[in-house]
């Protein structure tokens, strides 16, 4: 599968090139070549002298390469710095698994610089192995076997490497409730079997520094005694943190570092310390005193993420040797801790050597390429091209599995800066291995223009040419440094170029030259920008039929408003100046109840188009015309004395007119008038035709109504009394009959049932026998 790797690299490079070429140039407030380069990876700058025309801003020089070429900029005058990478290979004679040793990147904002990193797994690389064991009481059988493992462990390491060392440490838990029993007797001997000798509980004890002496390992481990605690989870993460944070005390070399973690139970993590009133977060520092973690009761347990970061920082690969019931738990843990493995430990730890060998082979055959923490302005992505044919693109870290000894694999690293950055460095390394790649990052934001030595006369002798643009001396401004400031600051000059104290100079469409706006020439054909603050143009008006102001034959655009010719009107000159469609049969425009706009009536409220007549479903103002109808026809009512003045706009018709609205209203004397309203042109103007006859209804008989009402009330009262009397009589009759029945059922004699006789007769039993 190896021949595919160059093809994949070529494909990735072509895709990256296509992505860059397809980018556009989005610019904002660009006046220098540096501003242009910072605007985006697709931007380029034309340094050609006099490239911009009259009224064109300097930002015209900034565009895509294709656009600049089309505008007449020679290819040699286009400044387009690229991101690039320079590598320095490892020194000869050094055994390096990772190359190159150093890379220098020149980064343009938004444009990635790519370089290749090669990893070649070496055979026999030195190994340090630290055995960290749980000494809670349930591990008593395991401790007995581990005491004999010194020679086997070193022999297993020597099968892999020529330089192997082993060390030993142990842990139990924090020595406060509820983790251990704090009774003095239990602290001396925490084991459930009092006859068995146990050591007091402790958090972590560093027993043996890393050594290649197997006898010393067996001797020191042989001195260890089992201990005990209360709860099931152990303080293993506390111990692992100290092993990672104390490299000098443990004796770690700058080689492959393995940490074997042997236990038969779970683990406490951050937050559990609150159960023992331990609130201070773990600080991730070394706190060993006399090889004991004596500050255990002062700091909480570390979090899993904190421990993972510390292990990766210390380049330590943990191997979790756990019993069967705990395998799934620690497999979840390995998903968070990179470069870690899990092995199933037998109940008495007899298989620990084979477990370590298997886990090491698994760890060393998988390579993770990662980097240290970077600022937000730098982004790193990895493309992995593995020897087994598997490829991954644009991942947050490199990842290859099944890596074989002496078979190189390639990672492509792509680094992108989001802005012009300061010079800085970071390192890339393969997790679990000691080799690193140092990456030095420098900004690529300046243009190497060739006009630095040109004659100052181009800028009127008051400035110098930089990348085709005049950089004026103090006291002068302008495109050719033609404007003298006379002591005024640039802010004061720009103030007169801001409309309504806006923050935008010349509406963003011009340059402020000597305190006056010089409007830009637009790229849009036939568009003209003008106005004191360049706030106007001749295209930003309403459109009709796809044209501004309906086209030049209808009107022209002036600063956002259409000015129509004599034959047209409307906001977009869309209407002819005609009222033909607004005239009624009498030739009155909109019946006098609206305005004619675009040959269509815009009616007043209460009327409807097309000619502003009464709404068919709307109410008729009959009541409002009743007083005028009464005075005009019958010469009476509230307007009888001034009828001609009050009802001058209402005409009395002698004969009915078809199409009128029928009304029926009461007059001042309560009689009904029937009349017809006929609408005339204008607002609230009606003619009226009134029927000759009034409908006057006789008044009601008040005496009859009052007498009937009083009589009805009296009769209803009498009827209610009769009904009440009848009901009470029936109730009394029913009670009397029941009493009679009870009387017949009773049996009485002449004796009082409550009387008790005062005489008592007692019989003598002896007398009866005789």
Swiss-Prot record:
Protein name, UniProt field: Integrin beta-2
Pfam families found in the cross-reference section: EGF_2, EGF_integrin, Integrin_b_cyt, Integrin_B_tail, Integrin_beta, PSI_integrin
GO molecular function: amyloid-beta binding; integrin binding; metal ion binding; protein kinase binding
The encoding gene: ITGB2
Binding site residues for Ca(2+) 2: 173, 229, 231, 233-234
Modified residues (Phosphoserine): 746, 757
InterPro entries the record matches: EGF_extracell, Integrin_b-2_sf, Integrin_beta_N, Integrin_bsu, Integrin_bsu_cyt_dom, Integrin_bsu_tail, Integrin_bsu_tail_dom_sf, Integrin_bsu_VWA
Keywords: Calcium, Cell adhesion, Cell membrane, Disulfide bond, EGF-like domain, Glycoprotein, Integrin, Magnesium, Membrane, Metal-binding, Phagocytosis, Phosphoprotein, Pyrrolidone carboxylic acid, Receptor, Repeat, Signal, Transmembrane, Transmembrane helix
Glycosylation sites: 50, 116, 254, 501, 642
Lineage: Eukaryota, Metazoa, Chordata, Craniata, Vertebrata
First and last residue of the signal peptide: 1-22
Post-translational modification comment from the UniProt entry: Both Ser-746 and Ser-757 become phosphorylated when T-cells are exposed to phorbol esters. Phosphorylation on Thr-759 (but not on Ser-757) allows interaction with 14-3-3 proteins.
Record note on domains: The VWFA domain (or beta I domain) contains three cation-binding sites: the ligand-associated metal ion-binding site (LIMBS or SyMBS), the metal ion-dependent adhesion site (MIDAS), and the adjacent MIDAS site (ADMIDAS). This domain is also part of the ligand-binding site.
């Amino acid at each position: 599968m190896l021949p595919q790797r160059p093809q994949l690299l070529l494909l990735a490079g072509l895709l990256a090139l296509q992505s860059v070429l397809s980018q556009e140039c989005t610019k904002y407030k660009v006046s220098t070549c540096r501003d242009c380069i910072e605007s985006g990876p697709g931007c380029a700058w034309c340094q050609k002298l006099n490239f911009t025309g009259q009224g064109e801003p300097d930002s015209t020089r900034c565009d895509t390469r294709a656009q600049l070429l089309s505008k007449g900029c020679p290819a040699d005058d286009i400044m387009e710095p690229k991101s690039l990478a320079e590598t320095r290979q490892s020194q000869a004679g050094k055994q390096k698994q990772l190359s190159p040793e150093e890379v220098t990147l020149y980064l343009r904002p938004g444009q990635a610089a790519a370089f290749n990193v090669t990893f070649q797994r070496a055979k026999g690389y030195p190994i340090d192995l630290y055995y960290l064991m749980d000494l809670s009481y349930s591990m008593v059988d395991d401790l007995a076997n581990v005491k004999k493992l010194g020679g086997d462990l070193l022999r297993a390491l020597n099968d892999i490497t020529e330089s192997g060392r082993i060390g030993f440490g142990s842990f139990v838990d924090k020595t406060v409730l509820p983790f251990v029993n704090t009774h003095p007797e239990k602290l001396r001997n925490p084991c459930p079997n009092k006859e068995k000798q146990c050591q007091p509980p402790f958090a972590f004890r560093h027993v043996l520094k890393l050594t290649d002496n197997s006898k010393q390992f067996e001797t020191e481990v042989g001195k260890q005694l089992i201990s005990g605690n209360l709860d099931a989870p152990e303080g293993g993460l506390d111990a692992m943190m100290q092993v990672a944070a104390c490299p000098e005390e443990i004796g770690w070399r700058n080689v492959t570092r393995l940490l074997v973690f042997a236990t038969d139970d779970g683990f406490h993590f951050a937050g559990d310390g609150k159960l023992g009133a331990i609130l201070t977060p773990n600080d991730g520092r070394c706190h060993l005193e006399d090889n004991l973690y004596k500050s255990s009761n002062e700091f909480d347990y570390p979090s899993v993420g904190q421990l993972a970061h510390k292990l990766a920082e210390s380049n330590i690969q943990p191997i979790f040797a756990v019993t069967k019931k705990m395998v799934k738990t620690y497999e979840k843990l390995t998903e968070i801790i990179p470069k870690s493995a899990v092995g199933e430990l037998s109940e008495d730890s007899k298989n620990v050597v084979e477990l370590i060998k298997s886990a090491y082979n698994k760890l060393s055959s998988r390579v993770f390429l990662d980097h240290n923490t970077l600022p937000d302005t730098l982004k790193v992505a990895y493309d992995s091209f593995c020897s087994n044919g598997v490829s991954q693109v644009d991942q947050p870290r490199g990842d290859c599995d099944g890596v074989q000894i002496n078979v190189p694999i390639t990672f492509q690293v792509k680094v992108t800066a989001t802005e012009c950055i300061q010079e800085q460095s970071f390192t890339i390394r393969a997790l679990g291995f000691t080799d690193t790649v140092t990456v030095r990052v420098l900004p690529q934001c300046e243009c190497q223009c060739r006009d630095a030595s040109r004659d100052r006369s181009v800028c009127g002798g008051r400035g110098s040419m930089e990348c085709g643009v005049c950089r004026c001396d103090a006291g002068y401004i302008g495109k050719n440094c033609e404007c003298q400031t006379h002591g005024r600051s640039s802010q004061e000059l720009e103030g007169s170029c801001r409309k309504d104290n806006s923050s935008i100079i010349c509406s963003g469409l011009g340059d402020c030259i000597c305190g006056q706006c010089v409007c830009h020439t637009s790229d849009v054909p036939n568009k003209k920008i003008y106005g004191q603050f360049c706030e106007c143009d001749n295209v930003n008006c309403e459109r009709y039929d796809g044209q501004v102001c309906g086209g030049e034959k209808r009107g022209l655009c002036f600063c956002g408003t259409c000015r129509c010719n004599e034959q047209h009107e409307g906001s977009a000159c869309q209407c002819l100046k005609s009222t033909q469609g607004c005239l009624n049969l009498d030739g009155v425009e909109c019946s006098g109840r609206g305005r004619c706009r675009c040959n269509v009536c815009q009616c007043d409220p209460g009327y409807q188009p097309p000619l502003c007549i009464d709404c068919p479903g709307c109410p008729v103002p009959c009541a409002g015309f009743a007083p005028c109808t009464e005075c005009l026809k019958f010469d009476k009512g509230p307007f009888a004395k001034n009828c001609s003045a009050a009802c001058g706009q209402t005409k009395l018709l002698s004969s009915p007119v078809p199409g009128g609205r029928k009304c029926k209203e009461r007059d001042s004397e309560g009689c009904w008038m029937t009349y017809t309203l006929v609408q005339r042109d204008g607002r609230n103007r009606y003619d009226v035709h009134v029927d000759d006859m009034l409908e006057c209804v006789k008044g009601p008989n008040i005496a009859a109504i009052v007498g009937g009402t009083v009589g009805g009330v009296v009769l209803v009262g009498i009827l209610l009394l009769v009904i009440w009397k009848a009901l009470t009589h029936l109730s009394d009759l029913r009670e009397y009959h029941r009493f009679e029945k009870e009387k017949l059922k009773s049996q009485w004699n002449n004796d009082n049932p409550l009387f008790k006789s005062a005489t008592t007769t007692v019989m003598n039993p002896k007398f009866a026998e005789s």
